[in-house]
Design a protein with these regions (language model features):
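Preference for intrinsically disordered or flexible, low-complexity segments
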Residues: 1-136, 140, 144-145, 149-151
Length: 151
């Protein structure tokens, strides 16, 4: 459901989104959360909850360290608004899926609010797989994304 991308485009320009969601159903559900005002509410909580703010700064440090291990983007912050605000839940959920539970508090929170998008089988058609056993196996394997590393 998430892929790790190169921090630079082929022309050398920065591409700060390290973790990119590949499932259109998940991306759509996240867009619904964004449209509902969740990001503004999360950003306000950063101002009043020092422990949450510290955890979010740690998520930012984790994100930047993983990106910089591939290619350093001097002067470019991490994605999603980290560490001072919440700007893109897609980036935060991608980070949460790739890093695992407990690393990105807002990514974890948004992920917990999503419907079970993986229950319907693969997010995109799989070549050679019909609606039969192959799709069921894919759905079973993805039934609990917290139990597997999705990238």
């Amino acid at each position: 459901q998430v892929v790790e991308t190169a921090p630079r485009l082929p022309d050398g320009s920065p591409f700060p989104t390290l973790y990119y969601l590949t499932c259109p159903r998940a991306a759509s559900a996240i867009g619904t959360l964004e449209g509902g005002g969740l990001m503004a509410e999360m950003t306000k909580r950063l101002e009043t909850d020092p422990e949450l703010a510290a955890a979010y700064r740690a998520a930012h440090a984790d994100y930047v360290a993983k990106r910089d291990a591939i290619d350093v983007l001097d002067g470019f912050p991490s994605a999603g608004g980290m560490p001072d605000r919440v700007k893109c839940l897609h980036a935060l959920v991608g980070h949460a899926l790739a890093a695992g539970p407990g690393v990105n508090p807002f990514g974890d929170e948004a992920l917990a609010l999503l419907p079970e998008w993986w229950r319907g089988g693969p997010c995109v058609p799989v070549a050679g797989k019909g609606a039969g056993k192959g799709a069921d196996e894919s759905a079973d394997a993805a039934a609990d994304p917290a139990q597997s590393n999705p990238h």
